[in-house]
């Protein structure tokens, strides 16, 4: 039997719960309380440093398209080292699963053990993303409908992450959930809030990592949203971008009802109706 690949792609649109699941993985693998500083050991797919180190080149000398062309090769170098070390690595991905200049996905297919796609009600995403980026909600709602939306795409300075093309929120969801090159398990953020033990057990089972009920329960307790929020307040978190707010801000569903203006909620529902309906976000008003 062929040995399974070592990279689990943990994919999501920004502010959809990706980091919370990374914390669960950290707590599960270490069998200790989740530590935010340990998440740096789970480098995201768009890490410029990881890309440069893997290929031994300086990405500052490359265009964004040239980097996209080489990113799968960098993933394969990292995966090969993980295979030698006997390690299975969870890697955060915010890119939509678009194809790059050579016609292949921007992350490596051959390195992939599987994909976990985390989806969240886009109305809650909009509120969370506005706080995270210090942008207006009007701006964020328009951004979520932009076909050219991207992270790390600044032209006048070098960011620690390489460009990540997002597309619209709907395009992002469909790019991961309507493909079969990297088998995906779709996890709703709301279900994770409701029953994190069941969701994390399903993730482990899907990834072929084995489900030990006591270990799962301990990992979930050790990475609770409250604990992560308290830790961030005490020690900070390097993934926080807004100086005025926490990365782990509220961690609940349905907050859009009191935070998002009605006309913006209606625009999101119109822009993303088909995908929202498919994943149950328009049934009973989310």
Where are these regions (language model features)?
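PAPS/PAP-binding and catalytic site of the sulfotransferase fold
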Residues: 17-31, 186-211, 219, 227
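Short acidic/His-enriched helical or mixed secondary-structure segments at domain edges of catalytic enzymes
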Residues: 221-244
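Short, flexible loop/turn segments with low-complexity composition
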Residues: 214-221, 280-286
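An amphipathic alpha-helix signature
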Residues: 123-126, 197-201, 213-217, 265, ...
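PAPS-dependent sulfotransferase catalytic domain
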Residues: 1-187, 242, 249-254, 258-286
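Short, surface-exposed helix-loop/turn micro-motifs enriched in polar/charged residues
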Residues: 82, 211-212
């Amino acid at each position: 039997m062929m040995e399974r690949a070592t990279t689990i792609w943990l994919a999501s649109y920004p502010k959809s719960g990706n980091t919370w699941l990374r914390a669960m993985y950290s707590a599960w693998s270490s069998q200790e309380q989740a530590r935010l500083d340990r998440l740096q050991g789970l480098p995201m797919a768009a890490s410029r440093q990881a890309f440069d180190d893997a290929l031994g080149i300086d990405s500052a000398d490359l265009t964004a398209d040239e980097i996209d062309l080489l990113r799968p090769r960098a993933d394969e170098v990292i995966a090969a080292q993980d295979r030698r070390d006997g390690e299975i690595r969870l890697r955060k991905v915010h890119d939509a699963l678009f194809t790059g200049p050579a016609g292949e996905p921007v992350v490596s297919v051959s390195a992939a053990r599987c994909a976990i796609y985390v989806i969240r009600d886009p109305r809650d995403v909009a509120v969370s993303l506005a706080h995270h980026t210090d942008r207006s909600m009007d701006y964020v709602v328009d951004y979520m409908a932009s076909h050219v939306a991207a992270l790390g795409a600044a032209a006048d300075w070098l960011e620690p992450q390489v460009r990540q093309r997002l597309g619209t929120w709907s395009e992002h969801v469909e790019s991961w959930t309507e493909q079969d090159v990297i088998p995906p398990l779709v996890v709703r953020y709301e279900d994770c809030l409701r029953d994190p033990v069941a969701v994390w057990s399903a993730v482990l089972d899907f990834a072929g990592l084995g489900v030990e009920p006591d270990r799962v329960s301990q990992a979930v307790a050790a990475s609770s949203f409250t604990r992560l929020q308290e830790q961030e307040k005490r020690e900070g978190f390097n993934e926080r971008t807004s100086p005025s707010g926490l990365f782990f801000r509220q961690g609940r569903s349905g907050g859009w009802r009191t935070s998002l203006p009605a006309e913006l909620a209606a625009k999101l529902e119109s822009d993303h109706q088909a995908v929202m309906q498919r994943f149950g976000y328009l049934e009973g008003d989310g």
